[in-house]
Each structure stands twice: as structure tokens, then as C-alpha cells.
């Protein structure tokens, strides 16, 4: 499917439908992916000089964009994202769309048994993942509000957040200001319209140059771009001057480790189910999937697990080596597309493998001050 005939729950990252239009928090059109990588601690994160990667034509460099850098702009963004606006992000017509109901699924104080398959249920087991994964809100160039999922990762500046490139800007669009989304606001641990750990505006962001240089709209170009669907953000400190990692903790991040056949956990804030498009999910709670990873039949660079998450889950982490007692693992990929693009079986949530290109973005982000 090349484009969705409607914006499912608005722009809540329609990403799970095609890279070019389903991106974001029910963004516009792309979906979910799972990238697989090797653990990398911030303490060992010296600048990386990767070898040229294959894929789209042209050199793979870092394309950056400035967000809220002044106190005035940061305050404006903070005031823009009211509890009601956050709940409605992704609604096609906010004026007549009812506010989604709260999800009051009770928490479970017991850790989830290791290697327990899950095709999509509210995460109730607490742990670090409930603090450093959250909902990333933004406004599209056409004025609609959308949301994706993002994760705080261990970094030198303690301010680095990873999501999908398509949550930041559309694939194939030129790198000019009006092609980027704006009003970026990350709420770690988002739950039923609340900000348990506060909200963080974004001061700068980056995607691979190979994400924006291909103007083609064919399926093959989407497949090529999928390998570069990672975006890095640098969050502003909170009102107390604390960097986000000091508030939320972080997940490890890894690059280049294949995980075929490994047990992987995926998290996200979907607005609806991939195979159950009703109100199975409403973006109010973090959803969890877990299972043995497998490559996409048509796109081996994409890996995924059985999962019913759809729009809104884009950018969410796929975690290897996940400890269900502590809620800590290693981000090896971020959700980017569904089985339609990858050629897998329904329902499968796919992520792009974090490789040299993502490592380059991460190095750029973690040294930003």
C-alpha cells in the first residue's frame, strides 16, 4: 500500500503503512522496525569512524536541524503541550474527536518471566523502561499534531534520545526548515495524559543524509531508505537544570550485532492495533511486545517480532538482552515499518538494524552541548 486513504487517528504515526507517509506518532505513513545491535556503553563511546555503508546513492552524512534553543522558545513549546492536546495528538479533527479514555489496567509488581512471548499488551511491570521510554509529540507542517515513541539512551551529554527518522521529517524531502516537523516535546513515562517525570523540549536533531536525498516514491526507494530510518534528538534540560538522563535513567544502545533468532522486546505508544484497528490501543499507555526476531522476507535489513502495534509506535525501541526484573536492555533497533513493506507475516513489527549510519548520528548527538 503506497498511501493510506485516511490518517488513522490523524497523524499518530501512520508510519506503519509506508515509510513515506506513515511516520511519527501516527505520523503520516511508515511503520515499525527492529534494529539489532551490539551493546555500547557511553563510557566507551569514543567518536566513531564507520566505513561507508551501502544503500542509497551518495555519501552518508549527518543532516541536522535546530529546535527550541532559547528560553522563550522552550517555554512556548512547554505551554503548547497541554494534557488535553497530548491526549488528542493524532486526531484527524481534534475539534470533534473525543478525548481517548484513560487506560486503567492495574500495575503488576511482579517481574515478567523471562522469554515470555507477548503480541501486544499494556506494560504493567515497571522497571527502568517505564521511565526512559516515552511519547514524542510534534506538529506537522500542515498544523496537525502527532506523536511517536522515543527512548533515552546512555550518552556523554546525558541528553540523547533515539527515535525513527520519519518521526522527524518525511523521507525524500529536501533538508529545508519547512520539511521538518516542529514543536517537539518528549514525555518519558507518558501515562493517560500525565507527565510523571516532566516534559522535555528538543534543542537539536539529526537524520542521515541518505534519508532525504531520494525523491523517488517507489517501493524500492522506501526499502532503501528503511535502512536509514533512525533519528537522534538532543533534549533540553528541565526547569531545574537537570539533563534528561539524570531524571529518567537510560537504556544501552548497540550497533552492528545481528539478532536473528534472539528474543527481543519492543515498546511503543500505538493508537490502534495493526489487525484490530478499533480502540484496542489509544496511545495512553505503553504497549509491550516480545518474541523471537526474524528478518523481513523482502527486506533482510529489517528484523521484527510478532506484534500488533501500529501507528504511534514508530521510533519505539527494540531491546535485546532485556532484563525483565530491572527493565534495562540494549536498543538494537527502532520501529520503522510493518509486514507490508518487509514482506513478513501479519502481525509483525519491524525495526531497522542500527549500523554505521545510526552510530554516526549517535556520536554526533552525544557530543552536542
Annotate each predicted stretch with a short phrase:
Residues 128-192, 287-297, 306:
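Catalytic histidine site
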Residues 332, 338-369:
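C-terminal cap/linker of serine protease catalytic domains
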Residues 226-230, 234-306:
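Chymotrypsin/trypsin-fold serine protease catalytic domain
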Residues 308-334:
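Catalytic nucleophile loop of clan PA
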Residues 2-4, 39-155, 369:
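Protease-domain processing segments flanking chymotrypsin-fold serine proteases, especially trypsin-like
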Residues 1-47:
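Secretory targeting and sorting signals
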Residues 82, 136, 150, 159, ...:
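Terminal peptide-recognition signature
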Residues 119-142, 153-154, 178-242:
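Conserved catalytic-core segment of clan PA serine endopeptidases
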Amino acid at each position: 500500500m503506497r498511501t493510506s486513504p485516511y490518517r488513522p487517528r490523524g497523524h499518530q504515526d501512520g508510519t506503519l503503512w509506508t515509510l513515506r507517509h506513515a511516520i511519527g506518532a501516527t505520523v503520516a505513513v511508515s511503520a515499525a522496525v527492529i534494529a539489532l545491535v551490539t551493546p555500547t556503553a557511553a563510557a566507551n563511546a569514543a567518536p566513531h569512524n564507520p566505513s561507508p555503508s551501502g544503500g542509497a546513492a551518495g555519501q552518508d552524512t549527518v543532516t541536522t536541524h535546530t529546535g527550541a534553543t532559547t528560553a522563550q522558545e522552550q517555554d512556548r513549546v512547554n505551554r503548547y503541550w497541554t494534557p488535553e492536546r497530548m491526549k488528542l495528538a493524532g486526531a484527524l479533527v481534534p475539534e470533534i474527536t473525543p478525548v481517548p479514555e484513560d487506560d486503567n489496567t492495574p500495575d503488576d509488581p511482579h517481574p515478567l518471566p523471562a522469554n515470555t512471548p507477548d503480541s501486544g499488551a499494556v506494560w504493567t511491570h515497571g522497571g527502568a523502561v517505564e521511565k526512559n521510554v516515552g511519547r514524542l509529540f510534534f506538529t506537522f507542517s500542515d498544523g496537525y499534531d502527532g506523536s511517536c515513541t522515543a527512548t533515552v539512551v546512555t550518552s556523554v551529554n546525558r541528553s540523547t534520545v533515539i527515535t525513527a527518522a520519519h518521526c522527524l521529517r518525511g523521507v525524500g524531502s529536501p533538508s529545508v526548515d519547512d520539511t521538518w516537523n516542529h514543536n517537539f516535546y518528549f514525555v518519558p513515562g507518558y501515562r493517560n495524559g500525565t507527565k510523571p517525570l516532566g516534559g522535555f523540549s528538543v534543542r537539536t536533531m539529526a537524520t542521515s543524509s541518505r534519508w532525504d536525498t531520494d525523491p523517488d516514491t517507489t517501493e524500492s526507494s522506501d526499502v532503501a531508505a528503511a535502512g536509514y530510518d533512525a533519528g537522534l534528538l538532543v533534549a533540553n534540560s528541565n526547569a531545574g537544570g537537570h539533563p534528561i538522563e539524570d531524571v529518567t535513567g537510560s537504556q544501552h544502545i548497540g550497533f552492528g550485532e545481528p539478532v536473528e533468532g534472539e528474543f527481543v522486546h519492543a515498546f511503543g505508544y500505538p493508537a490502534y492495533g495493526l489487525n484490530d484497528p478499533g480502540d484496542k490501543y489509544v496511545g495512553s499507555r505503553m504497549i509491550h511486545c516480545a518474541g523471537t526476531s526474524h528478518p523481513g522476507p523482502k527486506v533482510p535489513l529489517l528484523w521484527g517480532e510478532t506484534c500488533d502495534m501500529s501507528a504511534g509506535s514508530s521510533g519505539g525501541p527494540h531491546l535485546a538482552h532485556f532484563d525483565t526484573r530491572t527493565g534495562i536492555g540494549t536498543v538494537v533497533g527502532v520501529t520503522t515499518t510493518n509486514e507490508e513493506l518487509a514482506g513478513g507475516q501479519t502481525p509483525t513489527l519491524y525495526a531497522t538494524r542500527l549500523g554505521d549510519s545510526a552510530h554516526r548520528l549517535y556520536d554526533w548527538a552525544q557530543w552536542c552541548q
